[in-house]
From Swiss-Prot:
Gene Ontology CC: chloroplast thylakoid membrane; cytochrome b6f complex
Subunit structure: The 4 large subunits of the cytochrome b6-f complex are cytochrome b6, subunit IV (17 kDa polypeptide, PetD), cytochrome f and the Rieske protein, while the 4 small subunits are PetG, PetL, PetM and PetN. The complex functions as a dimer.
Family: Belongs to the PetG family.
Gene that encodes the chain: petG
Name this polypeptide is given: Cytochrome b6-f complex subunit 5
Membrane topology: Single-pass membrane protein
Species in which this protein is naturally found: Pelargonium hortorum (Common geranium)
Length: 37
């Protein structure tokens, strides 16, 4: 039962982590583009 619970947590965290990295990279790109770098 604990394995299933941990598996569910991992499946829940992976999309959130990927989304966070994507948003961070996008904001860095927009910031650099705005500064003309």
């Amino acid at each position: 039962m604990i394995e299933v619970f941990l598996f569910g947590i991992v499946l829940g965290l992976i999309p959130i982590t990927l989304a966070g990295l994507f948003v961070t990279a996008y904001l860095q790109y927009k910031r650099g583009d705005r500064l003309g770098l």
